[in-house]
Amino acid sequence: MSLTSSSAPSDSIVELIQSQNLSGSGSGTGGNTGSTTMNSGNFIPTPSLTGTGASQSSGSASSGNFVSPDETDTKPSPSLMDHNDPTSSLSQQLAQGATLTSPYSTTTVDPSSLYFQLSPMSYIPNVSSATTVAAANMSAYFNQKSAYPTSHLGFPSNVGSHSFLQSNMYIPSSLSDCPTATMGSMSWNANQPGFSRKQRRERTTFTRNQLEILESYFVKTRYPDIFMREDMAHKIQLPESRVQVWFKNRRAKARQQKKTLAPSNSGVTCSGNNGSTGGGSSNGSTGSEVQPSSPATTDSELKFSEVIKEECDEQSISPSADDQKGVNSYINPISSSSGTTSYNGTSSFRPQAQYPYASYPAYDFQYSQSNTNSTNTYTLDGNSTWKFQMS
């Protein structure tokens, strides 16, 4: 049997060996002797059996001698049985409720940590006792019946080294495992019976007959009153509000089409009668043509093109004879002979160009030409000092 103690110092073992007088060498006959080997603080009693009637017992304190456990007998020496066995005393102390402490272990367990067993905090990870010493302390603490009885808490007396938390307690490893962190739970109020979300109304689809009735009223008036709207609603079997909204959208569409077609003459062309003024046969179209910028694909666009056609027909009516006379009285027709104008190249663009040089109007004053051969004499202080010939 071997006992290895890593917590006790080596000096205490040496003293124990010296007190038992196990070191030395001797001889004996017909008996069992034991050899003790100490290796770096390891106390290993190794009894040996001899059958020749003589045996030798030796003790060595060298650190280089090792004794194999297979070569030794499992039965301890009688000399060791007489003294205090450390393992038996340790088991007796633990049975009596003593506390085992180690000078190299600083782990202590506070009894107040049992509060976490009663707390509903499920996010505490699964923990266990760190060392066997801590487990022994807890076991010795709960075995004391007189100190703090824990029977009312429902905990087992033998705590051992199992987890302080319940074994069936589930601790999620990530946030996605938590049922309260999902998006479905965040919208819990949407599933409540008192919470009613406003549903969007479906778009009304008009049939061809309904559009024909509405377009016929739109040609008559663009702003029908309540009575006309109710009459239309009764005919097309739709609410009056739908009729009102349709007229509102139809007016907006008409304004938009008018803006796009009015500036460009290529969009809508209204052609009148193209023919001779003498009342002969017409070479062009006898009626008005409507050429929309884009082909009408819906019934509403067809009706709108008909409205534009009627307006063009009214504008393309030829003026009457009386209207033509009134126009001729203000505007003289321009003949083809007077189409060209000749300009005189010699005339200049001056106000006097319309008069010839000989026919200028006479003015009241005339210029007289003086004699160029006369001599002009100038006097200065009565003396004729300045004389010069005028040429």
Curated annotation (Swiss-Prot):
Residue range(s) of DNA binding per entry: 199-258
Key words of the record: Developmental protein, DNA-binding, Homeobox, Neurogenesis, Nucleus
GO MF annotations in UniProt: DNA-binding transcription factor activity; DNA-binding transcription factor activity, RNA polymerase II-specific; RNA polymerase II cis-regulatory region sequence-specific DNA binding; RNA polymerase II transcription regulatory region sequence-specific DNA binding
Tissue expression: Expressed in the bilateral AFD neurons as well as in the nine pharyngeal marginal cells. Expressed in amphid sheath AMsh and phasmid sheath PHsh glia.
GO terms of biological process kind: embryo development ending in birth or egg hatching; neuron differentiation; positive regulation of transcription by RNA polymerase II; regulation of microvillus assembly; regulation of non-motile cilium assembly; regulation of transcription by RNA polymerase II; thermosensory behavior; transcription by RNA polymerase II
Gene3D superfamilies: Homeodomain-like (1.10.10.60)
Composition bias, Low complexity: 34-64, 264-274, 335-347
Region described as Disordered: 1-106, 254-300, 312-347
Composition bias, Polar residues: 1-10, 86-106, 289-299, 315-334
SMART domains: HOX
Location relative to the cell: Nucleus
One term under GO cellular component: nucleus
Highest taxon in the source lineage: Eukaryota
Keyword Membrane: no
Alphabetical list of PROSITE patterns matching this protein: HOMEOBOX_1 (PS00027), HOMEOBOX_2 (PS50071)
Signal peptide: none
PANTHER family referenced in this protein's UniProt entry, alphabetically: HOMEOBOX PROTEIN, HOMEOTIC PROTEIN OCELLILESS
Family recorded in the similarity comment: Belongs to the paired homeobox family. Bicoid subfamily.
Purpose of the protein: Probable transcription factor. Binds to a motif including the sequence 5'-TAA[TG]-3' in regulatory promoter elements. Modulates expression of its own, and of various other, genes in the AFD thermosensory neurons or AMsh amphid sheath glia, incuding the nuclear hormone receptor nhr-38, the LIM homeobox ceh-14, cyclic nucleotide-gated channel tax-2, receptor-type guanylyl cyclase gcy-8 and VEGF-related protein ver-1. Required for the development and cell fate of AFD neurons.
Listed name of the protein: Homeobox protein ttx-1
Species for this entry: Caenorhabditis elegans
